[in-house]
Amino acid sequence: MEGANVNEDERKYLRQIKHIIDEGDKVIDRTGVGTLSLFGLHSTYSLRNGVIPLLTTKRVYWKGVVEELLWFIKGDTDAKRLSAKGVKIWDANGSREFLDSQGFKDRPEGDLGPIYGFQWRHFGAEYHGTDADYKGQGVDQLADVIEQIKNNPNSRRIILNAWNVKDLHQMALPPCHTLAQFAVKNGELSCQLYQRSGDMGLGVPFNLASYGLLTHMIAHVCALKTGFLHHVLGDAHVYLNHIDALKEQLSRDPRPFPTVHFEGRIDSIDDFTAESIILNGYNPMAPIKMPMAV
């Protein structure tokens, strides 16, 4: 059988999918689509030797992973600026119709509120829209994470937190991937991601690749190797209209994960560009279409 035993990590993800389809509780969720859901799943993915957990049993939108992460790192919250890069993944949540439905009738289209990037770079600052100057405001958690990894790598407090209770009511969508903790052991940087809500078909494949890439980027600027991505899921769910597509994915045998490297010596997390992030050896199977629940 093709690729037998070459990618046990991806099989962990596929086993989670099967477990949810077989054993999940049927829930009528916020979107009205309905899900099968389990609470409290965990998997570990190796990041050693440049490996990144970018699924191979379907094509994952790598450009979207990269551009969204760079957008987060900039502290940006404007879906239109991400869309201008050709990445439309936040367009639905930033649409006039969706913002109005959430009570944000006075907010410009595309303004998602103080979501991930704002919390990463300006935690605690007052949010005044996408174009305000937030320089020096709030806590730059991402810079603090990197400073601690460099200067206090044994700390148990190296945490990046997007769940700011004070700001939740201003967000177009509260954070699904809420908190990442980093740890340095034997010269390797590992990340543990807590995700309160995981759309296993569409969101989780993206999140695994994104936090795998973020860990590689932070390790690079800190002159460390990479270790592992530990992924903890709260509500892990399969949308009912994804079941057939995911059963098709379950029939596929994983190929080896690709690797990632960076062009040149990059010393600051803010200096990465899409062009400096190089993906190697990605050989996925055909895409599998699944509708996004908004």
Swiss-Prot record:
GO biological process: dTMP biosynthetic process; dTTP biosynthetic process; methylation
Any GO CC annotation of this UniProt entry: cytosol
Pfam entry (one): Thymidylat_synt
Enzyme Commission number(s): 2.1.1.45
Family annotation (PROSITE patterns): THYMIDYLATE_SYNTHASE
Protein family per UniProt: Belongs to the thymidylate synthase family.
Enzyme class: transferase
Subunit structure and binding partners: Homodimer.
Binding site for (6R)-5,10-methylene-5,6,7,8-tetrahydrofolate: D199, A293
CDD domains: TS_Pyrimidine_HMase (cd00351)
Keyword annotations of the record: Methyltransferase, Nucleotide biosynthesis, Transferase
GO molecular function: thymidylate synthase activity
Pathway in which the depicted protein is active: Pyrimidine metabolism; dTTP biosynthesis
Protein name according to UniProt: Thymidylate synthase
Catalytic residue positions: C176
Binding of dUMP, residues: R30, R156, R157, R196, S197, G198, D199, N207, H237, V238, Y239
Species per Swiss-Prot/TrEMBL record: Ascaris suum
Catalytic activity: dUMP + (6R)-5,10-methylene-5,6,7,8-tetrahydrofolate = 7,8-dihydrofolate + dTMP
